[in-house]
């Protein structure tokens, strides 16, 4: 469910929504959602000083409150 929200939010921001890829991994009990976007959309998804991706991450952590902390990152 959390991945679907991230995908929806990022696709809504992207100028090339068909290039958006979202994956989830767990390492040492920590969940990480990684977002891949086109280079043109990277700045738009990250936002000024990381505000946009941080806001998405905050919402994700509220949604996943019972399941622990989830990190959201944008792949290079």
What would you call each of these model-derived segments?
Residues 1-44, 52-76:
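RNA-contacting regions in translation and RNA-metabolism proteins
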